[in-house]
Amino acid sequence: TTFAGLCFGDLSPTSGKVDISISGKKDLNVGYLDQFPEHLILLKTTNELVTELKENQIFDSSLDRTFRKRLNRFGIQWDHISNTKGVDLPWAVLRIFLLILLCHCRFDVLILDEPTFGLGWDQRVKLRSFIRECMNHLHFMIVSHDKVFIRSICQQVIDLDELDSKHVRIREKETTKP
């Protein structure tokens, strides 16, 4: 969570700086989904949040229909949640809703902090498939203790548990069964 906060800019390092770039481009639109999804929506309804993102030209309105179809893939019906406050939704539903929503926004990079926390096996499998689809147009930084999930989806892994004062170990993607 601290690492995600440093990358997103919510936190400042005591020394040095954190830069994120893609092919030399540093002026990136970066989104962030906290490991506690209720922090993003607070007391708003899901519809109020989507409307706010549309008004601020963050949500890509041309993807509204696709967004709703993708919610359906996870068993989430927009008509059933649109007028529900985020704090009144089951935690797993809120997490999936926000993740799918942010993947339809105008971000170059989306930082996901513990995206599988609180999800069952089937939801994790669907989530992995969904994120892989989104990788065609969006870069992800995933911060997680779920090493099986990370190694099944990420092209590079920085294992901060193996961090020492001299280096961070970076592994190329390991092959696992989907």
Q: Where do the model's predicted regions map?
A:
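ABC ATPase nucleotide-binding domain signature region
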Residues: A4-E55
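Conserved ABC ATPase signature
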Residues: K85-L89
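Hydrophobic anchor residue at the start of the ABC signature
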Residues: L98-L99
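Helical segment within the ABC ATPase nucleotide-binding domain
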Residues: R124-N136
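ABC-family nucleotide-binding domains
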Residues: D113, L119-G120
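Conserved H-loop
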Residues: H137-S144, D146-S152
